[in-house]
Amino acid sequence: MANPTIIRLQDGNVMPQLGLGVWKASNEEVIAAIHKALEVGYRSIDTATAYQNEEGVGKALKAASVAREELFITTKLWNDDQKCPREALQESLKKLQLDYLDLYLMHWPVPAIDHYVDAWKGMIALQKEGLVKSIGVCNFQIHHLQRLIDETGVTPVINQIELHPLMQQRQLHAWNATHKIQTESWSPLAQGGEGVFDQKVIRELADKYGKTPAQIVIRWHLDCGLVVIPKSVTPSRIAENFAVWDFRLDKDELGEIAKLDQGKRLGPDPDQFGG
């Protein structure tokens, strides 16, 4: 079996290509989920202030027998905190029981309040101080990203966006790549696989490779060069989602999955959300 792949970000830091998402998990659930994930081999955990489970993540990490430098921990600056990223980060670090973050992401641009450029400047300062190794964004459209770059000269290393077979965001993914921004997929299984796992091509590939539909979709993300963070609190599924290193999809198979794209957004519109 091949080793789990890592991605080198444009700032020189590296991150695992596959991590555990903990959206909607309670503090109690997240402790058990992370314990299982670390046991299986995950080293990247993606949380957020808005998930209200940073304390659970912190407890799980504190109890883990994995060295801090082997872990890659991400959390996110919530919309209400865009005016005070320093205070928000310090609160997150306290809950996570960490001295530094591997990745700090601005959760949404919230153009209605128009603080995202100033928030980004604050995040740049936090990175310079060593409180955060890498900084990036979530849910930013091309015009939001361009403005950040134009006004600060600092490009996010990650743009974490809704991305799954029904919403492939190929134009944004390509723009990110051109600007050396790594695209990361949230809701990678289209919220439990509805409308995806029952697609003929997914079922056929699952049969061909002796894998589950979820494993096929996760492998699709990996083979498209995306960082992917499937969310689960179910031990068997956490293990299943990580058992994807012993096969690859070929170019034609990736092309067949590309045909499933409907531009079907399941989450909020980044131009409208918040404010």
Q: What is the predicted role of each segment?
A:
Residues 10, 85-106, 125-129, 150-151:
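CE4/NodB-like, metal-dependent polysaccharide N-deacetylase domain
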Residues 1-71, 122, 189-190, 256, ...:
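N-terminal binding-site loop/beta-alpha segment at the start of enzyme catalytic domains
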Residues 42, 98-101, 132, 156:
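A structural motif
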Residues 25-38, 81-97, 143-146, 167-168:
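Short, acidic/polar
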Residues 2-7, 55, 59-62, 87-92, ...:
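Alpha-helical scaffolding within the catalytic cores
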Residues 109-275:
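Beta/alpha (TIM)-barrel catalytic core signal, keyed to glycine-rich beta->alpha loops juxtaposed to Asp/Glu
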Residues 68-81, 103-109, 163:
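A short, structured active-site edge motif that brings together acidic residues
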Residues 25-28, 46-56, 78-85, 111-114, ...:
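Acidic-and-aromatic substrate-binding clefts and catalytic sites of carbohydrate-active enzymes
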